[in-house]
UniProtKB/Swiss-Prot annotation:
This is Capsid protein VP1. One of its GO terms (cellular component) is T=3 icosahedral viral capsid. It comes from Feline calicivirus (strain F9) (FCV). Gene3D superfamilies: 2.60.120.20. InterPro entries: Calicivirus_coat, Rhv-like, Viral_coat. The record marks 479-480 as: Interaction with host receptor F11R/JAM-1. Keywords: Capsid protein, Disulfide bond, Host cytoplasm, T=3 icosahedral capsid protein, Virion.
Length: 671
């Protein structure tokens, strides 16, 4: 023990010959680092205690340890702390742990060797005014009961959580569609044990670091007596990935019939080898609902399947507890619940490819986009931030040139301007002249009627497929007003660099700008601020629908169907040049989703969806699932006509191999 540490102990009337040593790294269980508090997570060190350097004065350390005590702050009475400073030999420092942290660590070590055969003392309140009858049939005996001893040990180590009346009743968790087309072994629902199973637990989980205990689940079937069929509720132990096979029925399970009137209740136990789970722990007991016998409806036929709805409700089990209280604003290192990826009203939805409002959804076999698309690792394969603002470039030209390469002045990827659009031109162009839009007979289209009734629209414009930008163009000595700019990603070619060729990969040499910058014979450098306003691709298919024209740096993120769920684009539109019309734009994400994924680390397994229920003004609804790559999926094959505005609500986490639920009303005609 160093002399400083020994002298500090004298002030507490402790024997300085005692060697009080400590290693705070033992408070933080990190398998990949042996010194996490000095290496990977130094910002967490103040949560465990106070650190002093050994070259500090012993009296100064003593006074600081007293002044930091809550007793001094309230009464100004100097009280020696319960735990004195100790020697942290590996770091060469003096460390004083918080008493609660040290006690939690010591009791945790004791509880690790807990003997479940020891007698327990049960304390119960004598107030029986809060009661809740069990409205259902309790099923038990098929699985091991939760360990009350483990729960008691966890409480002793971390503190008792708050009791409340919400623990006594079942709360809605989700609903599952069960149709006559689902075959035996089909998984309809899968959810890992954890606070996400119950809305109250999910809310309270924001105040804690860890949890433990079981959850009771109640199933209700909305079918009628004409139905036949059975479902199996299966308890899958940690570490096992559910598969769509009847082999899953070898695990503990209970059966419930489609004709059953009373709900079925059973307990989902917490099978664990530790005192508690951190909020990041997804390897827990799983609840799986699987088709045991096919659903039968004698009034259905091959052309028209029917079904019923299974409602899932939950409440915490008697042994469920939260542990390790934390301030609400503290961020956990493992990630948070993905409950805020879609705004609650569609009035706030704009695309991540263009900034107009989302007006529809488009189901496609494949969905792809690199720029401004983010995944659950906060990563993007693109070059733009999740916001829309003017693009900033400089352009150097001479000899009267109007076509040049922009140099980025605002960027996150060197050389590529932040916000640069992500599609290329359809073919080789020599930008010049005016718009040239004709019909099938070669006549110019000059009216709305002529455009809407044209059997063929030919776009012979020499700058077609480029984006139209309002421009603030400045150059020293240039007194003329700014002109409209046309921009794209392409390669510059030709004898006088007057030709551009399409290219779907981007770098600093492909930032093409077509604009009259009033350039003479001498070289002129213009500072350009460009606001994206329109598009010259008159008569083209939707922007972003052609994979070969979508620009990427190197990798193009892409997805296809998953488990009967289809990927979707979010559709909005951009104004066309010349004709007073618009063209559709396909977006891989709502811009709010892109922004949230870029700013926050969310917790989502790669085999699961974060599910949101979308409801239109007529009451039709369907679920959208967002996977860990940031793409969106639906379980329907078509939407029909949705009545905007739409509303969105977070439904929880669902296995990606399970078809997403929907209830879209058929269009009705009144004679």
């Amino acid at each position: 023990m160093c002399s400083t540490c020994a002298n500090v102990l004298k002030y507490y009337d402790w024997d300085p010959h005692f060697k009080l040593v400590i290693n705070p790294n033992n408070f933080l269980s990190v398998g990949f680092c042996s010194n996490p508090l000095m290496c990977c997570y130094p910002e967490l060190l103040p949560e465990f205690g106070t650190v002093w350097d050994c070259d500090r004065s012993p009296l100064e350390i003593y006074l600081e340890s007293i002044l930091g005590d809550d007793e001094w702050a309230s009464t100004f009475d100097a009280v020696d702390p319960v735990v004195p400073p100790m020697h942290w030999g590996a770091a060469g420092k003096i460390f004083q742990p918080h008493p609660g942290v040290l006690m939690h660590h010591l009791i945790g070590k004791v509880a690790a060797g807990w003997d479940p055969d020891l007698p327990l003392i049960r304390l119960e309140a004598d107030d029986g005014s809060i009661t809740a009858p069990e409205q259902g049939t309790m099923v038990g005996g098929v699985i091991a009961e939760p360990s009350a001893q483990m729960s008691t040990a966890a409480d002793m180590a971390t503190g008792k959580s708050v009791d409340s009346e919400w623990e006594a009743f079942f709360s809605f968790h989700t609903s599952v569609n069960w149709s006559t087309s689902e075959t035996q072994g089909k998984i309809l629902f899968k959810q890992s044990l954890g606070p996400l199973l119950n809305p109250y637990l999910e809310h309270l989980a924001k105040l804690y670091v860890a949890w433990s205990g079981s959850i009771e689940v109640r199933f209700s079937i909305s079918g009628s007596g004409v139905f036949g069929g059975k479902l199996a509720a299966i308890v899958v132990p940690p570490g096992v990935d559910p598969v769509q096979s009847t082999s899953m029925l070898q695990y503990p399970h209970v059966l419930f019939d489609a004709r059953q009137v009373e709900p079925v209740i059973f307990c989902l136990p917490d099978l664990r080898s530790t005192l508690y789970h951190l909020m990041s722990d997804t390897d827990t007991t799983s609840l799986v609902i699987m088709v045991y016998n096919d659903l039968i409806n004698p009034y259905a036929n091959d052309a028209n399947s029917s079904g019923c709805i299974v409602t899932v409700e939950t409440k915490p089990g008697p042994d469920f507890k939260f542990h390790l209280l934390k301030p609400p604003g503290s961020m956990l290192t493992h990630g948070s619940i993905p409950s805020d990826l879609i705004p609650k009203t569609s009035s706030l939805w704009i695309g991540n490819r263009y900034w107009s409002d989302i007006t529809d959804f488009v189901i496609r076999p494949f969905v792809f986009q690199a720029n401004r698309h983010f995944d659950f690792n906060q990563e993007t394969a693109g070059w733009s931030t999740p916001r829309f603002r003017p693009i900033s470039v400089t352009i150097t030209e001479q000899n009267g040139a109007k076509l040049g390469i922009g140099v980025a002045t605002d960027y996150i990827v060197p050389g590529i301007p932040d916000g640069w659009p992500d599609t290329t031109i359809p073919g080789e162009l020599i930008p010049a002249g005016d718009y040239a839009i004709t019909n099938g007979t070669g006549n110019d289209i000059t009216t709305a009627t002529g455009y809407d009734t044209a059997d063929i629209i030919k776009n012979n414009t020499n700058f077609r497929g480029m984006y139209i930008c309002g421009s603030l163009q400045r150059a020293w000595g240039d007194k003329k007003i700014s002109n409209t700019a046309f921009i794209t990603t392409a390669t510059l070619d030709g004898d006088n660099n007057n030709k551009i060729n399409p290219c779907n990969t981007i770098d600093q040499s492909k930032i093409v700008v077509f604009q009259d910058n009033h350039v003479g014979k001498k070289a002129q450098t213009s500072d350009d601020t460009l606001a994206l306003l329109g598009y010259t691709g008159i008569g083209e298919q939707a922007i972003g629908s052609d994979r070969d024209r979508v620009v990427r740096i190197s990798t193009l993120p892409e997805t296809g169907a998953r488990g009967g769920n289809h990927p979707i684009f979010y559709k909005n539109s951009i104004k066309l040049g010349y004709v007073i019309r618009s063209i559709d734009v396909f977006n891989s994400q709502i811009l709010h989703t892109s922004r949230q994924l870029s700013l926050n680390h969310y917790l989502l397994p790669p085999d699961s969806f974060a599910v949101y229920r979308i409801i239109d003004s007529n009451g039709s609804w369907f679920d959208i699932g967002i996977d860990s790559d940031g793409f969106s999926f639906v379980g329907v094959s078509g939407f029909g006509k949705l009545e905007f505005p739409l509303s969105a609500s977070y439904m929880g986490i669902q296995l990606a191999k399970i078809r997403l639920a929907s209830n879209i009303r058929s269009p009705m005609t009144k004679l």
